[in-house]
């Protein structure tokens, strides 16, 4: 990232995490988070400035709470900064799906009154069951879009909003065209972004859907394939061939 920043390239994470939780991914290096798409594009930062923030309608969250309340092993969490608030379901079940969030989670009696930027649904850690819950939510609460980053966990965004929308906000702010953007992805919450951006890249360990959505393909995250690609771009090279 620092090589790209030194070359005058804006680079940052496009993460499902809220903005307050992204720096820990980079060992606390805030320079790597100055430009950022957080909470699945609900928060857009450019050079440390929050240039866009979306929220999820409270009535929609109340409806999701009603749906999940009757589902065994499932629940709704809303975030207050880094704090996960368990609206429905049990912290013990959240721990099975997302241990980091469960560490500091606390149960609350209702959907928060404050504007909610990030909310998730947790389910049993089983891909088929997670997909079943998504189908129920899409039918019962269609004003929200749902994506599947991993079994046991579901992302929520307002209908029609995704990381792709956030990329457009950032590109417009930078005054660049879509073909001047490169995005990397590996899972269900990256699909819209991978389909939308002409130079989209999937890593080798990506889901089949993410690979199919991407224009370019590189090695695995474990081999630092993304870092190598970014370093090459910083040197003025084009590292994508297939």
Which ranges hold each PLM region?
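Active-site phosphate-binding/coordination module
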Residues: 1-93
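Residue-level signal for inorganic ion chemistry
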Residues: 4, 15, 119, 194, ...
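Hydrophobic/aromatic beta-strand patches that form the interior of the parallel beta-sheet core
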Residues: 12, 37, 182-184, 201, ...
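Conserved Rossmann-like nucleotide-cofactor binding loop
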Residues: 19, 189, 208
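Short amphipathic alpha-helical segments
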Residues: 23-27, 49-50, 134, 195-196, ...
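Conserved acidic, metal-coordinating active-site core of Asp-based
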Residues: 67, 71-184, 188-196, 205
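Asp-based, Mg2+/Mn2+-dependent phosphohydrolase catalytic module
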Residues: 196, 200-242
């Amino acid at each position: 990232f620092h090589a790209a920043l030194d070359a005058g390239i804006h680079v940052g994470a496009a993460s499902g995490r809220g903005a307050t939780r992204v720096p820990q991914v980079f060992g606390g290096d805030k320079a790597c988070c100055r430009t950022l798409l957080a909470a699945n594009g609900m928060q857009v930062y450019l050079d440390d400035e929050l240039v866009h923030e979306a929220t999820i309608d409270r009535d929609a969250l109340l409806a999701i709470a009603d749906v999940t309340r009757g589902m065994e092993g499932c629940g709704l969490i809303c975030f207050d900064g880094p704090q996960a608030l368990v609206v429905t379901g049990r912290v013990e079940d959240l721990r099975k799906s997302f241990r980091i969030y469960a560490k500091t989670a606390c149960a609350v009696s209702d959907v928060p009154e404050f504007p909610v930027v990030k909310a998730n649904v947790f389910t049993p850690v089983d891909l088929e069951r997670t997909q079943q819950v998504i189908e129920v939510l899409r039918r019962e609460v269609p004003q929200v879009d749902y994506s599947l980053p991993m079994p046991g966990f579901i992302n929520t965004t307002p209908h029609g909003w995704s990381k792709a929308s956030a990329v457009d906000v950032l590109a417009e702010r930078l005054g660049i065209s879509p073909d001047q953007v490169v995005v990397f992805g590996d899972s269900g919450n990256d699909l819209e972004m991978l389909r939308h951006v002409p130079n989209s890249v999937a890593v080798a360990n990506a889901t089949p859907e993410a690979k199919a959505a991407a224009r370019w393909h590189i090695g695995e995250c474990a081999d630092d394939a993304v870092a190598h690609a970014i370093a090459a771009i910083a040197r003025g090279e084009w590292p994508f061939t297939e």
